[in-house]
UniProtKB/Swiss-Prot annotation:
It comes from Arthroderma benhamiae (strain ATCC MYA-4681 / CBS 112371). Keywords: FAD, Flavoprotein, Glycoprotein, Monooxygenase, Oxidoreductase, Signal. GO terms for molecular function: FAD binding; monooxygenase activity. Pfam families: FAD_binding_3. Gene3D superfamilies: FAD/NAD(P)-binding domain. SUPFAM superfamilies: FAD/NAD(P)-binding domain. Glycans are attached at residues 130, 151. FAD binds at residues 9-37, 307-330. Transmembrane segments: none annotated. It comes from the Eukaryota. Its EC number is 1.-.-.-. This is Probable FAD-dependent monooxygenase. Residues 1-23 form the signal peptide. InterPro entries: FAD-bd, FAD/NAD-bd_sf.
Length: 430
């Protein structure tokens, strides 16, 4: 039987991009849901940075109602570039010579502000803030219950963990799996350190970078194996700053950090010293890369990113409680940013899950649809098979980025993007 007499109600844990995309898709299909987020308010984590939706773009558009698709230009980093049909080239440069070393294979893509996209996806969604999940239990064959740290609780027919790379839902479901050797639910930390900023650069500097690419670029330092990432977050036509003749830019510098390294660079405690470190790491770089970093004001607030991942373990490593609970996105397959695919896999998770689940949630009790448990098991089979190699490709891309001689045509750092399983990187787990 496809469903029971219990009306479907989906508990969405996490109000990030994947959780909100899931909510909008359920709303589009008339399925009851509730969204719970541990943050106290939408602005708790700041404005956020950029997001590229590329090979999952078609799936993403299928999830959304038409009125939100029509408003997507509100989220674009550079609406003019999109209107002109510019996709960007996603080049990798040599920071010492300025030479273009690699070009990531082109694809149709949208570069959006993560914060503006999240705000758009909140349209019409009643997010319950300050809700940190603390326990999960199956209360019947078709119902699940979760409790929150404020002593409140919620019940539904399906709980979906969308609570990010350090997912509490993941930890709880792994502990409920009953495996003789429990799966480690904590992330693996890569031997790399990263400092990033969001800074408003004057047009005279930003336009030098825009001449290289209208959206983003990356670069490596052959002398140190340090790495540089740059992207635009807005332009003079779509910002509301007092000085409109500026471009908000995302600037990241990362470097290898070896366990046995005697010359490891430590991240300073004070913000002004972190910015000074970024300035010093750019010494010896050619223009415009050096100028961009040196122009970051010392009063800028930097952000430290811990580069972590969680290679999706085999099916059954977490309990889906008889098909009443599951994971999507970073909760199921946290990966580094070095292939820009985490969000795309999360979107595909939601799309695949909903495509199979909607017929079950909207069918009559006597329809021949699959059971919800069958659908969840099949979803997890596909998702774990697809995303484990994706996590490892992103790990290899990160490691290659910080070992300059490893950046070759075969490196995942510059190779094609997409959902495929044609390489074996299991050795990275040793």
């Amino acid at each position: 039987m496809g469903s029971t007499s219990t009306p479907p109600h989906v508990l969405i844990i996490g109000a990030g991009i994947t959780g909100l995309a899931l909510a909008q898709a359920l709303r589009k299909h008339g399925v009851s849901f509730a969204v719970y987020e541990r943050d106290p308010d939408p602005l708790h984590r700041g404005k956020g940075w950029g997001l590229t939706i590329h090979w999952s773009l078609d799936a993403f558009l299928r999830l959304l109602p038409q009125h939100l698709i029509d408003r997507l230009p509100e989220t674009y980093v550079d609406p003019d570039a999109v209107a002109k049909g510019e996709n960007g080239n996603f080049l990798l440069f040599d920071l010492r010579t300025g030479e273009t070393k690699w070009k990531v294979p082109p694809a149709k893509r949208l570069r959006v502000s993560r914060e503006r996209l999240r705000r758009l996806l909140m349209d019409g969604i009643d997010v319950q803030w300050n809700k940190t999940i603390s326990s999960i239990s199956q209360i019947s064959e078709t119902a699940v219950r979760c409790e929150f740290s404020d002593n409140s609780s919620a019940e539904g027919t399906l709980l979906v963990g969308c609570d990010g790379s350090r997912s509490k839902t993941r930890s709880l479901l792994c502990s409920l799996a009953g495996n003789e050797t429990p799966v480690r639910s904590e992330n693996y930390q890569l031997p790399v350190r990263l400092i990033g900023v969001s800074a408003a650069l004057p047009s005279r500097i930003a336009l030098k970078m825009r001449a290289l690419d209208p959206f983003f670029l990356q670069a490596g330092d052959p002398a140190t194996s340090n790495f540089f990432w740059f992207s635009f977050l807005d332009t003079p036509i779509n910002n509301d700053r007092e000085d409109r003749d500026t471009y908000e830019c995302q600037i990241l510098i990362s470097w290898p950090y070896r366990k046995d390294g005697s010359n490891n660079i430590e991240i300073p405690c004070h913000n002004v010293d972190k910015i000074k470190l970024m300035h010093s790491l750019a010494d010896g770089w050619v223009e415009p890369f050096c100028e961009v970093v040196q122009s970051i004001p010392e009063e800028t607030e930097p952000k430290i990113i811990s580069l972590e991942d969680w290679p999706t373990p085999p099916k059954g490593s977490w309990s889906n409680l008889g098909g009443t609970a599951t994971l999507v996105g970073d909760s199921a397959h946290a990966m580094t940013m070095f292939r820009g695919e985490a969000g795309n896999h999360g979107i595909l998770d939601v799309s695949n899950l909903l495509e199979a689940l909607i017929p079950v949630l909207t069918s009559s009790p006597h329809s021949p649809a699959k059971t919800q448990e069958e659908v969840i098991n099949e979803y997890e089979d596909e998702m774990t098979t697809r995303t484990r190699p994706a996590v490892l490709r992103s790990r290899k891309a990160c490691l290659d980025a910080h070992d300059y001689p490893s950046i070759t045509a075969d490196s995942p750092l510059v190779a094609r993007r997409g959902a495929f399983e044609d390489d074996d990187l299991e050795y990275l787990l040793n």
